[in-house]
Amino acid sequence: MVHLPTFIARHLLTTAKYYTFRRSISALYITGDKAKKNYAPLQPYMDFEGTLNSLASLEDSIKARGLQINLNEIKAKYEKFNSLQSQIKQAEAERDSVSNKLREITKAGAATKDEIEKLKQSGVELRNHLKTLKTQSYPIEEDFVHSFLSLPNTLHPECPQNNFEKLLYRSPTARCEQQQPTHLAKKDLIRFIKNDRYYLLGTPAEFDVYSMQALTNYFVEKGGFMQMSNPDFVRLVLLEASATPLEHYHLVQEEDKPSEINRAYLTGGATFEGFLGAFARLVVYPTSLPLPCVAAGRSYEIVPNTSGLPDSLFTATQSNAVQTFVATRTAEEAYEQMEKILNLAVDFYKELRIHFRITYADASTLTNAECLRANIEMYSPAEQRYICVGRVSNYSDYVSKRIMFCIRGKNNYAFPHLVGGPVLYTTRLIALLIENGLKLEDCKLLGDREVRDEEGAAGLNEFKDLFK
């Protein structure tokens, strides 16, 4: 059995490109002078005062992540921006005052012609002054807001720092220490050409699909997750909202561009970004949370090869994956849901009888939106290092504020805390099982097809018995 990438996927990856230029215009925040040619599909919630008046935790986050961000410079930009906004409000108030006065004296008929002309002239001057102030404010506003949106999330107390990983769990199965051939040596099972073009043959092709379906069903049946189907394409505004580095995905070359700014990227449906479109500008009641979701599908994440070794299934761009996404009310609930996802993942991987571990990643490896990340890793005897086969991240309320995903309260609105991540990359799992000498056909998958078929047959027989 041959598992070939679909024609559409190959075409998209062939025509997709990533450009490394710095964008001068943000799709997430568009100033008034650019609003004529571009529209803003989202208006992020930005708490300038609250963020810039409590800099201690933010400074710690910036330092731990190794980011080159000058908070004093951003604060100076804010003061300049705020000063201009105050001048604009004052000019608008003066113009309104002149307009009201002119309307009143004209209605009363008590003003002379000179007084009316003087007020009209004053109104024209204020209008021109206001126009000048707004023109001056646009580049200042854009510079400040873009700098503000580049600020990272504050770190979770459990997040390790200083190039340190915290071990959460290690499976009892012993690690294979002996050097083994690479999985690419199995030419009868894997034909690898490059990262976006490979072929799985026979059992690996079947395992690729069944493992994804099995884990998805396990989360639905055991964890009570709601299964969703997400689009393979995500607009730039959502990538910016989730602070996703643009080099992670391919930019799609669109023939008909609905927007020169808000371009489409090929992400795959089993990605965190793939969920955001369904929750952007959504308002939910507190009683509907927590809201656990899971999606099975493709992931087209570009994996940088930092090992110096040849490309393999560990760096493949295309992979089947299982993505989790949970919205919660509080930070405490988010942490509990993160543990729940990890516990379900541990149940699944333990049945494979292979060594694996779960670690908290160092702060320097997180994206700006993440405050905590747990990596699910398996050991590669061929490359003598751990490979990430899945992960779960905590985003607190950082992303929900930027996509305006709100909780309706009695007197105000709050923002959900989000957790989630791809708990399985099938290509990496297949490669590691092969390298560790396990036969794919002998691996037990929780919630696999055989178990479901047996349960379905039993249910059908019970249904037939009703008519005897």
Question: What kind of feature is each model-predicted range?
Answer:
Residues M1-H3, F467-K468:
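A positional/structural detector of protein chain ends, strongest at the extreme C-terminus
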Residues V2-H3, F7, H11-L13, Y18-R170:
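N-terminal alpha-helical targeting/anchoring segments
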Residues Q68, S83, R170-K468:
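TRNA-recognition modules of translation machinery and tRNA-sensing kinases, especially anticodon-binding
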